[in-house]
Regions:
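A short beta-loop-alpha structural element at the N-terminal edge
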Residues: 2-18
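Conserved GNAT-fold acetyl-CoA-binding loop/helix
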Residues: 21-42
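A short helix-loop-beta-strand connector motif used in the catalytic cores of GNAT acetyltransferases and
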Residues: 43-55, 81
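Conserved beta-strand in the GNAT
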Residues: 55, 61-70, 86
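A conserved beta-turn-beta hairpin within the catalytic core of GNAT-like acetyltransferases
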Residues: 71-82, 92, 138-139
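Conserved acetyl-CoA-binding loop-helix of GNAT-fold acetyltransferases
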Residues: 87, 93-106, 131
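Conserved active-site alpha-helix within GNAT-family acetyltransferase domains
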Residues: 98, 121-139, 145
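Conserved GNAT acetyl-CoA-binding A-motif
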Residues: 101, 109-121
Length: 150
């Protein structure tokens, strides 16, 4: 198998949307994404000047992606917020995600990014990220303010 690691291109968005739909369709998420919703998420994530995206392509299809944005702070502190990271189910548990992290980290280091961060849910996802060197942060608290009634 020959995998191509590269930066995302606009032409990849539909293939990325297919990958996102497949990745979240089953346990533990069971999210019923439509193609339109998945495309909107990808387009919105990639719309800013600070957006970065990395993909793995195999036989013309995107099988994994890491999308996010650079956050800029004082004293030249830069971190990359991973907004979307997934591997198509058929390719999971084969080291593809680990390889994508390594590729993305190498690319981001070239831009003087000091750290990666993300928000995730579910024990399976937490275990995956911990195995790949992520640490649980106790800095801050995620808070939400509902704008609609439940």
């Amino acid at each position: 198998m020959t995998f191509v690691f590269r930066e995302i291109q606009k032409e990849d968005y539909t293939s990325c949307a297919d990958s996102l739909i497949a990745a979240y369709a089953n346990e533990p998420w069971n999210n019923p994404w439509t193609l339109e919703e998945a495309l909107l998420r990808i387009e919105a994530t990639m719309s800013g000047f600070n957006a970065r995206g990395y993909v793995i392509e195999y036989e013309g299809n995107i099988i994994a992606m890491c999308l996010g944005r650079i956050d800029y702070y004082f004293q030249n502190w830069r971190q990359f917020c991973i907004d979307e990271f997934n591997v198509t189910p058929h390719y999971q548990r084969q080291g593809i995600g680990r390889q994508l992290f390594a590729f993305a980290a190498t690319q981001l280091k070239k831009e003087a990014i000091q750290q990666l961060f993300l928000l995730t849910g579910g024990a399976q996802a937490v275990t995956f990220y911990e195995k790949n060197g992520f640490l649980t942060s106790n800095e801050g608290t995620m808070m939400v303010y509902p704008l609609t009634e439940a």
